[in-house]
Design a protein with these regions (language model features):
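Short glycine-rich or small-residue beta-strand-to-loop segments that form or flank ligand, phosphate
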Residues: 1, 10-12, 38-47, 54-57, ...
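Gly-rich Lys/Arg/Thr-decorated short loops/hinges at beta-loop-alpha junctions or inter-strand turns
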Residues: 1-13, 78-80, 151-167
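Glycine-rich oxoanion-binding loops at beta->alpha junctions
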Residues: 6-36, 183
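Short, acidic/small-residue loops that bind anionic groups at enzyme active sites
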Residues: 7, 12-17, 61-86, 222-225
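Short Gly/Thr/Asp-enriched flexible loops that form oxyanion-binding sites at enzyme active sites
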Residues: 50-64, 83, 207-213
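Short alpha-helices
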Residues: 72-112, 116-123
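Mixed-charge interfacial surface used for oligomerization/domain docking
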Residues: 106-210
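C-terminal non-catalytic interaction/assembly regions of soluble proteins
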Residues: 181-268
Length: 268
């Protein structure tokens, strides 16, 4: 909801904690956002979300509202997890919101936004790390447990486990693994990137900025130019202690302009 405003989203549809909104709730959001030119749904790749948003899309079609959907699956850590078939949609979704919101404000058609959205998603890669899992309110305990001296690589925003646990490392070592894994996920290493360091909810901003500094140093050493970077809590997981690293290939120059354009939202 913090990304609703001029230049980004027209509406956000929320379900219960770690639960997809219902098709009826989504349809209400579609109706509220519709201004006659159609509605674009930006959906993170979780099984429940995909099913419910597709049902809502069909319901909107019956009301003669033209609806299209872009699915975000930017997480490179794991292919399948508790809530997904395939890669998860995580913090890179925020950059998709920003770039598509800018182009929608510039008058792009629904079909143009769908095509652009698919290109943005394929150019965006994210990986996360956590020191402590989120506490699910209904359960009253963390989704998984970690010894105090361990971290988990590849965690999801719903507390899904990652791909490896090991002893806590200094920020520079964490940055090294995440940067190298992210860059290696591209078919060809990008020359110019935007970087988002996203806090999961329980990580102090100071630690996020230290990590960003380490990331920027590593990318400079690898000859990768960073022309946009942002730090903060943009896609959180309640009280999870951790962060994620997102990179977007900015070979397409107007994406840079889109990321830098002014918006009137609470959270950007």
């Amino acid at each position: 909801a913090g990304f609703v405003g001029d230049g980004m989203l027209n509406a956000a549809v929320l379900g219960d904690v770690f639960t997809s909104p219902t098709p009826d709730q989504i349809l209400t959001g579609i109706q509220a956002a519709d201004q006659g030119a159609g509605v674009l749904l930006i959906v993170k790749n979780y099984t429940g979300d995909i099913l419910n948003f597709e049902m809502a899309k069909d319901m909107a079609d019956m009301e003669d509202i033209h609806v299209e959907m872009v699915v975000v699956d930017d997480d490179i850590a794991v292919e399948d997890s508790t809530y997904t078939a395939g890669k998860r949609g995580v913090a890179g979704t925020v950059l998709v919101h920003k770039i598509l919101g800018h182009h929608a404000r510039q008058g792009a058609s629904l079909e143009e936004l769908v095509s652009l959205g698919e290109k943005i998603v394929s150019s965006t890669k994210t990986i996360g790390v956590a020191l402590k899992a989120a506490t699910v309110p209904e359960v009253g305990k963390p989704g998984f447990t970690l010894p105090e001296d361990e971290i988990e690589f590849g965690v999801g925003i719903h507390g899904e486990p990652g791909y490896r646990r090991e002893k806590i490392q200094p920020s520079k070592e964490l940055a090294k693994e995440l940067v190298e894994k992210t860059l290696s996920s591209y078919e060809q290493q990008p020359q110019t990137v935007g970087v988002l360091v996203n806090g999961m909810g329980g990580t102090p901003l100071m630690e996020q900025f230290v990590f960003m500094n380490d990331v920027l140093t590593l990318l400079e050493d690898k000859g990768v130019q960073v022309t946009f970077h942002k730090v903060g809590n943009y896609m959180t997981s309640i009280d999870m202690q951790g962060l994620s690293l997102t990179m977007i290939d900015l070979a397409t120059k107007d994406w840079q302009t889109a990321l830098e354009s002014n918006v009137t939202t609470i959270s950007w």
